[in-house]
């Protein structure tokens, strides 16, 4: 705002008429042209213009002053509306000055309108000049306040610009933190899915192990029952055999006593037999002598024989006699030692295939295989081209709308050509075994943002949906009403 200096004159300058020497140029309020016809530096004989023309010029000057004040107020209000608020003290001082200026101008206008035409016009002009001098001081003070207000507003504007820059930087950092948090949340979700699958697999293994332990417990119970029965039977057999052994010991002791007694009897009978044999030999000799004597007497005693010679040698053993009749059966003998095992018998026929047993425990990790051949060089990825995938708006982590993360933003997948092969790849990326059902036409609600993938065509063997054939990133002819979705299988 341009502040023009106002050159005002005091009451002592009335005589020289200096206030009428320069025309009123619309900028200086102190040098008023009270004539109606432009520059009036030529004074009339009466010392001034006519009263009617001077009054008209004064009214025009007051109206111009009113218009100037109005424009100043309009500018102040525009600045107040377009800029941030200033301090309350400056606004209160500015409001008081404007109100005082309005009241002074209103009083001046009323005095001018009510003043009689016959009054001394020169006195009225000097009074107006004094009033304008006072108003000029007020306007100068008001201009200073406006300048200070404008400086304060510019300072606030600079602070607001700095604040906007800081807010933009904060929004960028917040967006980066949000993207990082979303990526970490996705990774945690994938790890959670894998952990759930591992827990379910371990639960299945534990169930199988529990069943096997139960079957083994039943078998152990059967074996224990069989062992108890065998123990009972063996105890009975051992007791029976002990009884038999005791009886056998009694029989053996009796047999030993009988044997000793029979040996004594045999010895006695042997002595008797020896005595009988000796007696029999004597008798035999006597009989032989008697027989010889008789034979000599009966024959013609022509030859005389001498006495018998000594006893001859024992003759040859006679022929073996016939076997006698079998005797009575004796008691059962002790069991003999166990014989050698016999030869193995012929192989029997194959039996029927039994039921499949429970799944065994996981084996040890095998040896590392040979190093494979070097693959072809892949395409170079971008610095920020880190792609991920998630399921949104489903009843659980196993189902929902398919969204991929590309270029630091999440986007959806169009259902053009969407089938179970594509869904199977997506589910295996998320750690599930496979896909149960695929959906089209935004079954889980319409997404927002970009549609990153369209015309997806997977073979079903890919490890990632980004290895499948599809149109370029963000190139699509679909809307969010065609967002694809899946439901993965949960064991």
From Swiss-Prot:
PROSITE patterns according to UniProt: SRCR_1, SRCR_2
Cystines in this chain: 414-478, 427-488, 458-468
Keyword Transport: yes
Glycan-bearing residues: 102, 134, 193, 231, 254, 300, 393
Extracellular side: 82-491
Biased composition (Basic and acidic residues): 364-380
Compartment(s) where it occurs, according to its Swiss-Prot or TrEMBL record: Cell membrane
GO-annotated biological processes: cellular response to heat; endocytosis; intracellular iron ion homeostasis; iron ion transmembrane transport; protein homotrimerization
SUPFAM superfamilies found in the cross-reference section: SRCR-like
Topology relative to the membrane: Single-pass type II membrane protein
Domain (SRCR): residue spans on this chain: 389-489
Listed transmembrane segments: 61-81
Regions of this protein lying in the Cytoplasmic compartment: 1-60
Transmembrane helix among keywords: yes
Region of interest: Disordered: 301-380
Keywords of the record: Cell membrane, Coiled coil, Disulfide bond, Glycoprotein, Ion transport, Iron, Iron transport, Membrane, Receptor, Signal-anchor, Transmembrane, Transmembrane helix, Transport
Expression (tissue specificity): Expressed in the testis, trachea, lung, bladder and small intestine; especially in epithelial cells associated with mucosal surfaces.
Subunit details: Homotrimer.
HAMAP family for the chain: SCARA5
Family listed: Belongs to the SCARA5 family.
Full protein name: Scavenger receptor class A member 5
């Amino acid at each position: 705002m341009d502040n023009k200096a106002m050159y005002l004159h005091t009451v002592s300058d009335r005589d020289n008429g200096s206030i009428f020497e320069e025309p009123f140029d619309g900028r200086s309020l102190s040098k008023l042209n009270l004539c109606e016809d432009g520059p009036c530096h030529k004074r009339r004989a009466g010392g001034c213009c006519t009263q009617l023309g001077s009054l008209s010029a004064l009214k025009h000057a007051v109206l111009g002053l009113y218009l100037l004040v109005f424009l100043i107020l309009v500018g102040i209000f525009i600045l107040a509306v377009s800029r941030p608020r200033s301090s309350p003290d400056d606004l209160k001082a500015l409001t008081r000055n404007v109100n005082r200026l309005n009241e002074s101008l209103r009083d001046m206008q009323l005095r001018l309108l009510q003043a009689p035409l016959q009054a001394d016009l020169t006195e009225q002009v000097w009074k107006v000049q004094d009033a304008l001098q006072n108003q000029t001081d007020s306007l100068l003070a008001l201009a200073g306040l406006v300048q200070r207000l404008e400086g304060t507003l510019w300072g606030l504007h600079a602070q607001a610009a700095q604040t906007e820059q800081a807010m933009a930087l904060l929004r960028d950092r917040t967006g980066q933190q949000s993207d990082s948090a979303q990526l970490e949340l996705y990774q945690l979700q994938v790890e959670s899915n894998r952990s759930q699958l591992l827990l379910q697999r371990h639960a299945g293994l534990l169930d199988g192990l529990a069943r096997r332990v139960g079957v083994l417990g039943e078998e152990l119970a059967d074996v224990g029952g069989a062992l108890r029965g065998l123990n009972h039977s063996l105890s009975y057999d051992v007791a029976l055999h002990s009884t038999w052994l005791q009886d056998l010991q009694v029989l053996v002791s009796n047999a030993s006593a009988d044997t000793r007694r029979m040996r004594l009897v045999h010895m006695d009978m042997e002595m008797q037999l020896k005595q009988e044999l000796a007696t029999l030999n004597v008798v035999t000799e006597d009989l032989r002598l008697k027989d010889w004597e008789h034979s000599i007497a009966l024959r013609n005693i022509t030859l005389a024989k001498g006495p018998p010679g000594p006893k001859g040698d024992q003759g040859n053993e006679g022929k073996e006699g016939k076997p006698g009749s079998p005797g009575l059966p004796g008691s059962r003998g002790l069991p003999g030692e166990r014989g050698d095992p016999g030869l193995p018998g012929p192989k029997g026929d194959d039996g029927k295939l039994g039921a499949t047993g429970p799944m065994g425990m996981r084996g040890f990790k095998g040896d590392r295989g040979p190093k494979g051949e070097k693959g072809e060089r892949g395409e170079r990825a971008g610095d920020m081209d880190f792609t991920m995938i998630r399921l949104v708006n489903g009843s659980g982590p196993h189902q929902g709308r398919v969204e991929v993360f590309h270029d630091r933003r999440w986007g959806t997948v169009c259902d053009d050509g969407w089938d179970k092969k594509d869904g199977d790849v997506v589910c295996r990326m998320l750690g599930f075994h496979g896909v149960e059902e695929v959906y089209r036409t935004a079954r889980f609600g319409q997404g927002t943002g970009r549609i990153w993938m369209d015309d997806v065509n997977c073979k079903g063997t890919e490890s990632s949906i980004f290895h499948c054939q599809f149109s370029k990133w963000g190139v699509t002819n679909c809307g969010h009403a065609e967002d694809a979705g899946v439901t993965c299988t949960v064991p």
